[in-house]
Structure formats: structure tokens, C-alpha cells
Amino acid sequence: GKGRPFLYFAYGAAVTEVVIDTLTGENRILRTDIVHDTGSSLNPALDIGQIEGAYVQGAGWLTTEELVWTDKGYLATHAPSTYKIPACSDRPRIFNVALWNQPNAEDTVGKSKAVGEPPFMLGISAFYALSDAVAACGNGSRYVALDAPATAERVLAAVQRQRDV
């Protein structure tokens, strides 16, 4: 293979702070700081909204959106009553988004870059912040497995395993 599979890359970084209840596994995102590469932003307010929404969706994917299957292979979590997607209240209490506003070197509209899907992956920072919080329940030097999605039940189980180490 030769060729160029992508016209350009959009980069981003996120740092997330969480808190966990070690008796129940309940958790909350307290703060997130994001910088995202938008190229020359065509509409900064719109781009920030897209970045925030994609982050919350990505964090939900890794913390609450659990697929449960029955013994017969049917999806049990197929409705809003059984499949927990993020709500407005699940966004970080402190949410800072900065745009890395450098013109795209490629010939794109207004030298801009995509902001709809790439920031989705920044939600991974919420999952790893939970993993760090679980590790802090021990001596902080050992990480036990935390399965995704990191539901309250899975966080609690990881805390218990961490304390047993």
C-alpha cells in the first residue's frame, strides 16, 4: 500500500478530574480541561459546543453506556429506561475548552478542521481518571483492571479489588 488515507489529522488533549464514592462506586466528573486542534475555526462558539458534546458522549460511552445481553442473545438494554446515556447533569462542573487555532495546511474550507467526531475520543480521559482514582484507594502504585464501561458497579468492584491487593 501506497496512498494517503487521511487528508489531515485533528489533534486534541484532555485532562479530567473525577471523584468516586468508595462505598457505592458512584462517581462524578468534576473538571475537564480540553485543547482541540480546529485549524482556523469558522465559528468558535459552535466549535466549542461540538467539542463539549463529543467529549460528554465519549465519556458516557466509557462510563455509563452498558450493553447487556440476555441468555438468548437479545439486547436487554435497548431503551431509554435500560440504557443510560449521559444527561446534561453528567457534564463536568468545571468545563474549559480552548481552541488550538492554527490554519490547516491542507486545502479545506477556510483552513478549518473537523470538530464533530475527533473530540469524542477525549472522553477516554474520564475513564483513565476513574482508573487513577481507583488506584489511589490503595497505595497508588498498582492499578487493578477497570472494565469499560466504568459503571458504578464496576468502579466499586475495582475499589474492592484494589483494597484486597
Where are these regions (language model features)?
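Cofactor-binding beta-sheet edge motifs in enzyme active sites
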Residues: G1-V165
